[in-house]
C-alpha cells in the first residue's frame, strides 16, 4: 500500500477517535462510556428530579455492570470527584417482577449488595457506599442529594455537544482530508518522476569546432595558399 494511503487511514482513524470522545474534560471515559459527577446539591421531591440533572446533558444516572466499572467509579469518586459517602445509583425496584432495574434500560448483570435481607418496596433505591464500594438499599424519599453521577454511552449524542467542540471536530476532519489529498498528490508526482528518470542515451551532436572539422578547414587553407 502506498505510504500516502496508509498515512491517510491513520489520520482518519485519529479523527474518528477525536469525534467519538467524551464532550469535555469534565467527563471521564471508561469501557466505552463517559462519566461526569455533577457536584451540585439539589432539593428533590422524587428521584426523577435527580435523573433530570443527567438527562439534561444527554446522559442518565449511573448504571454499573462489572467489578471493574464499580472499582473505577469508586476510585474516581475518592480521588477526583470527592463525592458523598452514599451515592444514589440509577436504579429502581420494579414490583411487577420483584427485581431492580436500571433507568438507562441496560441489563442488571452485576450487583454488589452488602446485605440482601429486608423487604424491597417500590420506594427502595440503591446507593453506592463510597468508603467500601458496596451497595446499600435505602429509601427513595430523600429531600436532597449531594451530587449526581451521570453516564452516557460513546458515541456521545452530538446534539449535546457544544458548538466549539463540533467546530473543532469539523476542522480536524477537514485538515485530515486535506493532508490525505496532498499526500496522494506528492506520492503520484514522486512515482512519475522516478519513472521518467530512466531516459535513453543519445550521442552528443557533433560540434562544428570538433577535431574532424578543424582538419578539413586546415586542408582547405593549405590548398588555397598553394594556388596563390
From Swiss-Prot:
<dbReference type="GO" id="GO:0016020">
    <property type="term" value="C:membrane"/>
</dbReference>
<comment type="function">
    <text>Potential multifunctional C-type lectin receptor that may play roles in endocytosis and phagocytosis as well as in cell adhesion and migration.</text>
</comment>
<feature type="topological domain" description="Cytoplasmic">
    <location>
        <begin position="187"/>
        <end position="228"/>
    </location>
</feature>
<feature type="transmembrane region" description="Helical">
    <location>
        <begin position="166"/>
        <end position="186"/>
    </location>
</feature>
<dbReference type="GO" id="GO:0006909">
    <property type="term" value="P:phagocytosis"/>
</dbReference>
<dbReference type="Pfam" id="PF00059">
    <property type="entry name" value="Lectin_C"/>
</dbReference>
<keyword id="KW-0732">Signal</keyword>
<feature type="topological domain" description="Extracellular">
    <location>
        <begin position="21"/>
        <end position="165"/>
    </location>
</feature>
<feature type="disulfide bond">
    <location>
        <begin position="125"/>
        <end position="140"/>
    </location>
</feature>
<keyword id="KW-1015">Disulfide bond</keyword>
<keyword id="KW-0963">Cytoplasm</keyword>
<dbReference type="GO" id="GO:0005938">
    <property type="term" value="C:cell cortex"/>
</dbReference>
<feature type="glycosylation site" description="N-linked (GlcNAc...) asparagine">
    <location>
        <position position="107"/>
    </location>
</feature>
<keyword id="KW-0430">Lectin</keyword>
<dbReference type="InterPro" id="IPR050111">
    <property type="entry name" value="C-type_lectin/snaclec_domain"/>
</dbReference>
<keyword id="KW-0472">Membrane</keyword>
<dbReference type="InterPro" id="IPR016186">
    <property type="entry name" value="C-type_lectin-like/link_sf"/>
</dbReference>
<keyword id="KW-1133">Transmembrane helix</keyword>
<keyword id="KW-0966">Cell projection</keyword>
<keyword id="KW-0812">Transmembrane</keyword>
<protein>
    <recommendedName>
        <fullName>CD302 antigen</fullName>
    </recommendedName>
</protein>
<dbReference type="InterPro" id="IPR001304">
    <property type="entry name" value="C-type_lectin-like"/>
</dbReference>
<keyword id="KW-0325">Glycoprotein</keyword>
<dbReference type="GO" id="GO:0030175">
    <property type="term" value="C:filopodium"/>
</dbReference>
<keyword id="KW-0675">Receptor</keyword>
<feature type="domain" description="C-type lectin">
    <location>
        <begin position="30"/>
        <end position="149"/>
    </location>
</feature>
<dbReference type="GO" id="GO:0005902">
    <property type="term" value="C:microvillus"/>
</dbReference>
<feature type="signal peptide">
    <location>
        <begin position="1"/>
        <end position="20"/>
    </location>
</feature>
<dbReference type="InterPro" id="IPR016187">
    <property type="entry name" value="CTDL_fold"/>
</dbReference>
<dbReference type="GO" id="GO:0030246">
    <property type="term" value="F:carbohydrate binding"/>
</dbReference>
Amino acid at each position: 500500500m502506498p505510504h500516502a494511503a496508509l498515512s491517510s487511514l491513520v489520520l482518519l482513524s485519529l479523527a474518528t477517535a477525536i469525534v467519538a470522545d467524551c464532550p469535555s474534560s469534565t467527563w471521564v471515559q471508561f469501557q466505552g462510556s463517559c462519566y461526569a459527577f455533577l457536584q451540585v446539591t439539589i432539593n428533590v421531591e422524587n428521584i426523577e428530579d435527580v435523573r433530570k440533572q443527567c438527562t439534561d446533558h444527554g446522559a442518565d444516572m449511573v448504571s454499573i455492570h462489572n467489578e471493574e466499572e464499580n472499582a473505577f467509579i469508586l476510585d474516581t469518586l475518592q480521588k477526583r470527584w470527592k463525592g458523598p459517602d452514599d451515592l444514589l445509583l440509577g436504579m429502581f425496584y420494579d414490583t411487577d417482577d420483584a427485581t431492580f432495574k436500571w433507568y438507562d434500560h441496560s441489563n442488571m448483570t452485576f450487583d454488589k449488595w452488602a446485605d440482601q435481607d429486608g423487604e424491597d418496596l417500590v420506594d427502595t433505591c440503591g446507593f453506592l457506599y463510597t468508603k467500601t464500594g458496596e451497595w446499600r438499599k435505602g429509601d427513595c424519599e430523600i429531600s436532597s442529594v449531594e451530587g449526581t453521577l451521570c453516564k452516557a454511552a460513546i458515541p456521545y449524542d452530538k446534539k449535546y455537544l457544544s458548538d466549539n467542540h463540533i467546530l473543532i471536530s469539523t476542522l480536524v476532519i477537514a485538515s485530515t482530508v486535506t493532508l490525505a489529498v496532498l499526500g496522494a498528490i506528492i506520492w503520484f508526482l514522486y512515482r512519475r518522476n522516478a519513472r521518467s528518470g530512466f531516459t535513453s542515451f543519445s550521442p552528443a551532436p557533433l560540434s562544428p569546432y570538433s577535431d574532424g572539422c578543424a582538419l578539413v578547414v586546415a586542408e582547405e587553407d593549405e590548398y588555397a595558399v598553394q594556388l596563390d
